[in-house]
């Protein structure tokens, strides 16, 4: 499945390079118009990241997200700075279909386990942003990639699988925003090891060949941000590479 994405800071569409707020590109685009265009080209899911909220949970862009959801028919998944059950409930009540949880899954796993039980497997997606070290270990970063988490991807899957983990978004941080291609080896490995989880691939997508490579890795979906914003290809072309999306 092709999942177009936009990242938002202070209501503006942006892209970061490798998660670095100091390396920000701002696009002169209306978030709603951009998402509506993706929807018109056939996207059935859209991914929104609240980067303001990821950096400062007190400044989450909830009102804007509500306006976007209200004016879109596609399913929306939202991440960025979600730290409490009240925030999860607020987003779901706005009509967001799936809430993406990152740092908290590392820092307070019991809390996130309870959300999987309360809201169901389809309402919660874990965002596992990994740095792969020289030993090949997949270390999950936290707090908008501003600090390392110290836990491995495998240990986190083991923590959440008994509670019904079904959706997980995995980004190789070294590829994010780089347009250097996706780490398909990473996705092949985790899909083979955990076939019951619907893995979303993210980071580095630049070409339609990259899209096809991720599809062939066995991932369930692919998050595409920058490549669409800079018109490397269209949503329609990406969907043509990934039938049954």
From Swiss-Prot:
Residues forming the catalytic site: 7 (proton acceptor), 129 (proton donor)
Pathway listed: Amino-acid biosynthesis; L-histidine biosynthesis; L-histidine from 5-phospho-alpha-D-ribose 1-diphosphate: step 4/9
Primary localisation category: cytoplasm
EC class of the enzyme, as a word: isomerase
Cellular compartments annotated: Cytoplasm
Swiss-Prot/TrEMBL keywords: Amino-acid biosynthesis, Cytoplasm, Histidine biosynthesis, Isomerase
Catalysed transformations (reactions): 1-(5-phospho-beta-D-ribosyl)-5-[(5-phospho-beta-D-ribosylamino)methylideneamino]imidazole-4-carboxamide = 5-[(5-phospho-1-deoxy-D-ribulos-1-ylimino)methylamino]-1-(5-phospho-beta-D-ribosyl)imidazole-4-carboxamide
The EC number(s) this enzyme carries: 5.3.1.16
Domain of life assignment: Bacteria
Matches recorded under InterPro entries: Aldolase_TIM (IPR013785), His_biosynth (IPR006062), HisA_bact_arch (IPR006063), Isoase_HisA-like (IPR044524), Isoase_HisA-like_bact (IPR023016), RibuloseP-bd_barrel (IPR011060)
Protein family per UniProt: Belongs to the HisA/HisF family.
Protein name: 1-(5-phosphoribosyl)-5-[(5-phosphoribosylamino)methylideneamino] imidazole-4-carboxamide isomerase
Organism: Shewanella loihica (strain ATCC BAA-1088 / PV-4)
Gene from which the chain derives: hisA
């Amino acid at each position: 499945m092709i999942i177009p994405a936009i990242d938002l800071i202070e209501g503006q569409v942006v892209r970061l390079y490798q998660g670095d707020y100091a390396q920000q590109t701002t696009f002169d685009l209306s978030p709603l118009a951009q998402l509506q265009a993706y929807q018109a080209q056939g996207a059935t899911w859209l991914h929104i990241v609240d980067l303001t909220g990821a950096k400062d949970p007190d400044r989450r862009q909830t009102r804007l997200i509500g306006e976007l959801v209200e004016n879109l028919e596609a399913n929306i998944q939202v991440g960025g700075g979600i730290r409490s059950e009240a925030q999860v409930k607020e987003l779901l009540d706005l009509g967001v279909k799936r809430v993406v949880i990152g740092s908290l899954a590392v820092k307070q796993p019991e809390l996130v386990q309870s959300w999987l039980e309360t809201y169901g497997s389809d309402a919660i997606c874990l965002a596992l942003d990994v740095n792969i070290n020289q030993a090949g270990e997949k270390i999950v970063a936290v707090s908008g990639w501003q600090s390392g988490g110290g836990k491995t991807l495998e240990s986190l899957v083991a923590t959440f699988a008994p509670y019904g983990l079904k959706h997980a978004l995995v980004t190789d941080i070294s590829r994010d925003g780089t347009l250097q291609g996706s780490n398909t080896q990473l996705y092949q490995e985790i899909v083979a090891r955990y076939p019951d989880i619907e893995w979303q691939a993210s980071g580095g997508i630049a070409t339609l060949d990259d899209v096809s490579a991720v599809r062939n890795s066995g991932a369930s979906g692919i998050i595409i941000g920058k490549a669409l914003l800079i018109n490397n290809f269209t949503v329609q072309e990406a969907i043509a590479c990934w039938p049954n999306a």
